[in-house]
């Protein structure tokens, strides 16, 4: 196999043209076979095999720097830098990351995970080159979807300031930019290379300027009218107006043509954008037909593309989806917002039933938050469904635009807590900390799927900013018989005991139930309380505990600093309440990728670890 010849970076440059043709097919087959076992991002990676090969043929790694936006499409890059053997442990605890990692390889120049950051990072690397006097190329690879993120436009606006070569590769896998231009754009792409286009444009302007009397007037007229004409035919005029030379579109399956254009781009003294057309899922039928299903795929059967492990129970996203549909039916003021995650957040069903009340704002969490604030100000009830790690990007808007005005915006925070295989950039372990410091913000977390429904109903009836956080994965269906009405800042008693009281929040209630059973086996009868609210929490319930308890244990799936337990501890100490407080929370660190249950055990927040800590504290 040709693939066996790739042991380290730049080995691809030793291959013949025939071997390159074989290599791209072997890489695709390897990715399909490997990801069918481990799970991972398949569709996006199948779409950029040739593009990645062309980049590795034209640039020298690790000297040259390639920044992968989001980074989930970097699998071929990992293979071409000698990490093929790592795919057997892809996204598993202690194994290879599914994203670029600077501590994994010198060829990964910048860690990524979230969208729309690559151009900013690339500009920083290119500017540092100018300051230090070093000599290397910088390439930022960004998808057309990531260009909907405002940060990308901020960087594009700043790109013209860069001194020296800076290449942006637009990986367009939806053809949304080019479909309106047709054959004329293909014709123009033949001469819009760096040298040819720049020389052609300069020669025309110079010639016109030398025409007596009328020449200068003609140049001015051309400059005043060119954009309106070119916008009809040339897809890259948006970038050119920002001072970025545009090359393309280029066929993303043609390695030779991409290499030709990349070599031209390398000669540009300034920012240049290469527009490459790719196809998600290329080479694997199921992924081509249903690319969204193979975005972050679970292990699947290659012949059919169907998951190997069929789900028998609903996950929290499914439950939220069902509840949102019901809320939409009952209240015409309920509207839904997503930042390009309609399927991932479960809002697709709401979209299908209430298209006029559904808003996809693109990858723009900050905008989505202030947009929601505007909707709320006008009397609607906006529900912004968003992953915990992505809501971090909207902190200022939550504080400044929503909470200062005390607006009724509902934040449905999915993937709160440990998410597992996507690793440190996606773990939702900070939201309680960054939301609880904001005045007027209410934070809830359900113990099971029924409470999620009850809390959403409470949130719609509430008047003010409110967040509901729930984890990734199967919705807990235990404790169905305990379903007290949701009241602001009121907890729920699950089990009465003595000596030790456990106040668990959200997903940790299930862990607490298991820990209580382990304690009972040791002769310890613990009180178990479902906290429900992280902020404001149930102070009255805490005040009553010293009568029969000496130890209060708080449990949460959030970092300790600024978390639920820390706020409770401060309250107990400040008010002189006769309780020792043991905080069970995640450590104040970034948590790597891995199975959630494995991570909980390693981080000592599983039931067995909690029980041992309680016994030691008593």
Tell me the role of every PLM-derived stretch:
Residues 1-80, 240, 244-246, 251-255, ...:
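N-terminal amphipathic, basic-rich helices that act as targeting or association modules
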Residues 24, 41-162, 316, 333-334, ...:
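Cofactor-binding active-site loop characterized by glycine-rich and histidine/acidic residues
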Residues 65, 270, 278-392, 397-407, ...:
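Non-catalytic terminal/interface segments that mediate subunit docking, oligomerization
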Residues 299-303, 307-310, 420-422, 442, ...:
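Peripheral docking tails and interdomain loops at the edges
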Residues 260-263, 295-296, 305, 315-330, ...:
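Glycine-/acidic-rich phosphate or pyrophosphate-binding loops and their flanking alpha/beta elements
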Residues 218-286, 408-413, 432-481, 607-618:
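Structural signature of the thiamine diphosphate
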Residues 86-96, 161-175, 196, 403-415:
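A glycine-rich helix N-cap at a beta->alpha junction
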Residues 174-320:
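Long, well-ordered, tryptophan-enriched scaffold segments
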């Amino acid at each position: 196999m040709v693939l066996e010849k790739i042991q380290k970076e730049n080995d691809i440059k030793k291959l013949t043209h025939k071997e390159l043709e074989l290599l791209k097919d072997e890489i695709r087959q390897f990715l399909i076979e490997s990801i069918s076992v481990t799970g991972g991002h398949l569709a996006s990676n199948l779409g950029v095999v040739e593009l990645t090969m062309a980049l590795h043929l034209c640039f020298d790694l690790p000297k040259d720097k390639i920044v992968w936006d989001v980074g989930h499409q970097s699998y071929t890059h990992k293979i071409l830098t000698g990490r093929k053997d790592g795919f057997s442990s892809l996204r598993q605890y202690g194994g290879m990351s599914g994203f670029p990692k600077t501590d994994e390889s010198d060829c990964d120049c910048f860690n990524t995970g979230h969208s729309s950051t690559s151009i900013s990072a690339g500009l920083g690397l290119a500017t540092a080159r100018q300051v230090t006097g070093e000599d290397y190329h910088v390439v930022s690879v960004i998808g057309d979807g990531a260009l909907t993120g405002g940060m990308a436009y901020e960087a594009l606006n700043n790109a013209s300031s860069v001194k020296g070569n800076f290449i942006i590769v637009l990986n367009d896998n939806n053809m949304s930019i080019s479909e309106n231009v047709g054959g004329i754009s293909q014709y123009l792409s033949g001469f819009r290379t760096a040298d040819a286009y720049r020389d052609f444009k300069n020669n025309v302007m110079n010639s016109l300027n030398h025409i007596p009397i009328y020449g200068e007037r003609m140049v001015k007229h051309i400059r005043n009218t060119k954009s309106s004409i070119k916008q009809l035919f040339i897809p890259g005029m948006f970038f050119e107006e920002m001072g970025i030379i545009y090359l393309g579109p280029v066929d993303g399956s043609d390695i030779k043509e991409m290499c030709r254009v990349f070599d031209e781009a390398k000669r540009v003294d300034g920012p240049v954008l290469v527009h490459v057309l790719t196809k998600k899922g290329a080479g694997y039928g199921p992924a081509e037909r249903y690319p969204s299903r193979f975005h972050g795929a679970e292990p699947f059967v290659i012949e059919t593309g169907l998951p190997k492990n069929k789900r028998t129970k609903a996950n929290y996203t499914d439950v939220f989806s069902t509840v949102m549909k019901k809320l939409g039916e009952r209240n015409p003021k309920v509207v839904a917002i997503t930042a390009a995650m309609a399927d991932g957040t479960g809002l697709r069903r709401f979209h299908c039933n209430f298209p006029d009340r559904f808003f996809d704002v693109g990858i723009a969490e900050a905008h989505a938050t202030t947009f929601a604030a505007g909707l709320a100000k006008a009397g609607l009830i906006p529900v912004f469904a968003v992953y915990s790690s992505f809501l971090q990007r909207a902190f200022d808007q939550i504080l400044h635009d929503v909470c200062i005005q005390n607006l009724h915006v509902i934040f449905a925070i999915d993937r709160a807590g440990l998410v597992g295989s996507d690793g440190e950039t996606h773990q939702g372990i900070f939201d309680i900390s960054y939301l609880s410091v904001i005045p007027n913000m209410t934070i809830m977390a359900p113990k099971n799927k029924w409470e999620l429904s009850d809390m959403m109903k409470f949130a719609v009836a509430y008047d003010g900013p409110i967040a509901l956080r729930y984890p990734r994965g199967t919705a807990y269906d235990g404790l169905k018989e305990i379903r007290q009405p949701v009241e602001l800042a009121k907890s729920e008693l699950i089990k009465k005991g003595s000596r030790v009281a456990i106040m668990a929040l959200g997903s940790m209630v299930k862990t607490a139930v298991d820990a209580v059973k382990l304690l009972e086996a040791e002769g310890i009868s613990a009180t178990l309380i479902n906290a429900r609210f992280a902020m404001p929490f149930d102070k009255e319930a805490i005040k009553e505990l010293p009568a029969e308890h000496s130890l209060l244990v708080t449990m949460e799936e959030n970092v300790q600093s600024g978390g639920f337990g820390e706020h409770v501890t401060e309250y107990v100490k400040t008010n002189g309440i006769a309780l020792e407080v043991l905080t069970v929370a995640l450590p104040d660190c970034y948590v790597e990728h891995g199975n959630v249950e494995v991570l909980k055990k390693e981080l000592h927040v599983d039931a067995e670890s909690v029980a041992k800590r309680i016994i030691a504290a008593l």
